[in-house]
Structure formats: structure tokens, C-alpha cells
Amino acid sequence: MEIETATIATPHKGRPREFCVDMALAAALRVFWSKGYEGASMADLTEAMGITKPSLYAAFGNKEALFNKALDLYEREKADYMHAALDAPTARGVAERLMYGALDMYTCPENPNGCLGVITSVACGAEAECIRQAVLERGAAAKRAMLARFARAKEEGDFPPDTDAEGLAAFLTAVNQGMSVQAGAGATRAELERLVETSLKLWPGR
């Protein structure tokens, strides 16, 4: 795998020092995930990434651009279970994979607690409205994909005829967002797992 590097400008004479862009971006992701977009200061980011502010701007653009790159990384590496869940053979399997995938991510000791998207959309103020809207649009796209999968399941007879596919997509979204908030507040894995199990007992169809 090719590792992308960038050069840090230094105030002293001599050869500029290179840094790994991927590692710096992963460090930035952890800061945003822990503190939210507005809570993450440039000092927090540059310290965690091990680079100077000019080097951050040169490699990633401004703070907003850095956050969007970190969010892309988050979706690729942390929230990839969402795409895999839609390939489950049944709608119940989709729900199970989505909720347990979220549970695993929210409670993994290597990750900050909760969901980056939920943390950011809740914590952003008026000055970061563009970031909030971008995060909400990604969430809406995920919900649309879920709704399309459930509509197909209904056509295939996987649900009772009177099932509200849109309501189920909203229900799953609310459960996962609720787990994120509870994980951020210190809920244990056992407590969240009980929520998942109860939700699956309420699930219609097979």
C-alpha cells in the first residue's frame, strides 16, 4: 500500500521534515470524534497531528476541509458496517447488522465514544452550520439507502403488507443515534446490547 507523505515547513535551515498524511488525518479524526467540530481547536489538531498550522493548511486546506476529509475516513474505516448491512439477505438481517455494527463501533475501547456524525450535528452552532448541514446530508443519504432496501424487502414479501418501511428506517436511525448519545454519556456495552435485543424483538416479519 502506498503511503502518502507531505513536507513540513520548518523555521530552521536544513532539510524539511516529512510526515505521513494518513497518520495525521487519523489523528485529526480522533480529535474531531472526541470534541466535535467546534470543540476541536487548531491547537488541538496540530498537536495531535504533530504538524504546524502552515503544514496543516498546505496538506489539507482549512479546518472545514480537514473535517470533511476526516469524515470521509470515518465512513470508510469506522462506519463501513453500514454498507455491508444493506447486503444482508433479509430486512431483519439488515437491522441486526446495523445495530450491532453501531454497538461495536460505539463501545470499542480504541474509539472515542459515540458517533462522529451525531456528535457534530448536535454540537454545531450557527457559525458551523455548513458543517452541520453536510453531516446531516450524509445521514439523510444513508437513511435513503436504508429505505430503498426496506421498500425492496416489502416487495419481496419480507414484511407484512401493512408495514411502514419509512417508519422502520426512521426507527433504526433513532435507535442508532440514541445509542450514540448514551455511549457518549457512559452507557455500558451490556446496557446498549439490551436496547438492540429489545429493538429486534419488536421487528416485524422474518
Where is each model-derived feature located?
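Helix-turn-helix
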Residues: 2, 23, 27, 31-65, ...
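Amphipathic C-terminal alpha-helical segment
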Residues: 105-108, 152, 172-189, 202-206
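Amphipathic alpha-helical packing segments from all-alpha helical-bundle domains
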Residues: 79, 129-156, 167, 194
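N-terminal intrinsically disordered/low-complexity leader segments
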Residues: 1-19, 162
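Short, basic, alpha-helical segments at the C-terminal edge of helix-turn-helix-like DNA-binding modules
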Residues: 72-78
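Hydrophobic alpha-helical connector segments
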Residues: 69, 83-113, 165-172
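Hydrophobic alpha-helical segments that form the core
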Residues: 4, 113-119, 163-182, 194-202
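Amphipathic alpha-helical segments used for helix-helix packing
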Residues: 95, 109-130
